Amino acid sequence: MTVAPRRLAWTNARQSYPVRVAHVLSVNLARVRANPDPRAQSKLTGIDKVAASEAVMVRAPGSMHAGVGSGLVGDTVGNPKLHGGDDQAVYAYAREDLDAWETQLHRTLHNGMFGENLTTSGVDVTYARIGERWRIGSDGLVLEVSAPRIPCRTFAAFLDLRYWIKTFTRAAKPGAYLRVIAPGTVRAGDTITVDYRPEHNVTVGLVFRA
């Protein structure tokens, strides 16, 4: 059954996250399935993510059209014309924002439910600056914040929520795409350290709302 969520009470004000060590809560890989959007060009989708039990290799996937799609080995991009590639190699979403959506939607949202590769904790992803670099774990992995996620029909169909694209857009909590600066492995529990933060104030949320 398709459910229309209530109007969000969120504002665009910065959210106060509990003080904790920023870390990767879950690393999620695609469980390939039929695309739930009957109008989609691609008949398969990788939006359905499940937690990986071991470390996952992350490397630059190459161009969107000619590369391997996702930056995570073992992950799958269903429509390489719109997703994946070097500038969308990894998608991160904050567990804190998923928790807020659970309250809003009155349903459980497991890690990876929004199609994110990395479910983070202690990171305000919306206020990450474009060009900001994250060092993750101890294996040399460095990622750079590149862009916000733009919701698509497959996302809405996967969650089976009417008006989801408008609802998600209005909330302005899009999560962030990241490019791979230095390859390495990532696993649940790895710390996230901001290695570099640009002096500008262009954040993921600002670009999303532009």
Name the predicted role of every residue range:
Residues 2-137, 141-154, 200-210:
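Electropositive, beta-rich accessory/interaction domains or terminal extensions
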Residues 107-115, 160-173:
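Short, basic/aromatic beta-hairpin or loop at an interaction surface
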Residues 120-122, 175-182:
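Short alpha-helix capping/helix-loop boundary micro-motifs
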Residues 131, 183, 187-189:
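Loop/turn positions that initiate beta-strands
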Residues 146-168:
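Histidine/lysine/aspartate-rich catalytic loop segments that bind and position anionic ligands
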Residues 173-177, 188-190:
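A structural signal for small-residue-enriched, beta-sheet-centric alpha/beta enzyme cores
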Residues 191-196:
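Short hydrophobic beta/alpha edge segments that flank linear recognition/processing sites
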